Amino acid sequence: MENTEVKVGIADLNLVSSPNKIMTIGLGSCIGIALYDRRSKLAGLSHIMLPDSTQFKNVTNPMKFADLAIPLLIKKMEAKGCQKRNLIAKIAGGASMFSFSDKSMVGDIGKRNIQAVKKSLSEERIQIIAEDVGGNKGRTMILDALDGKVTLKIVGIGIVEL
């Protein structure tokens, strides 16, 4: 059986089953949320851009927001036979990519994304078992559905496993 590597774009999500991998690139202030079910060997990955959809009148893409994308990813995994109680999470991203002297104008979107993702996963009762968040480096995230291992390629640092 040939394994494939499925790509998840910005403000997108997808699922793969073993022995496939799923990846996303360009995690700056964005966050990659990797959900994994050891029993079914199903892996889900979401690439969120913003913390909270309630600040917007028209939400055309729920996958852009932590508060909407995480429940949507869980529902898609449950539709494939996962039980939410078996899911574990690993997260990466949330960097401060720009240094502004006055962060009050834009806020620290990376930090707000981290907080929103942790809040949403906590509300869903999904444990975060590993994370690589914050800092000021971009990341690529690869989730292996065979064993749930996450490999990060961090700009200027190298490869880190979660």
Swiss-Prot record:
Catalytic activity field: L-glutaminyl-[protein] + H2O = L-glutamyl-[protein] + NH4(+)
> What does the UniProt keyword field contain?
Chemotaxis, Hydrolase
The family line of this record is: Belongs to the CheD family.
Q: Spell out the protein name for this chain.
A: Probable chemoreceptor glutamine deamidase CheD
PANTHER family from the UniProt entry = CHEMORECEPTOR GLUTAMINE DEAMIDASE CHED-RELATED (PTHR35147:SF1)
Quote the EC number.
3.5.1.44
InterPro entries, from UniProt?
CheD-like_sf (IPR038592), Chemorcpt_Glu_NH3ase_CheD (IPR005659), Cytotoxic_necrot_fac-like_cat (IPR011324)
Gene Ontology MF, one: protein-glutamine glutaminase activity
- A Gene Ontology biological process annotation? chemotaxis
Q: What does this protein do?
A: Probably deamidates glutamine residues to glutamate on methyl-accepting chemotaxis receptors (MCPs), playing an important role in chemotaxis.
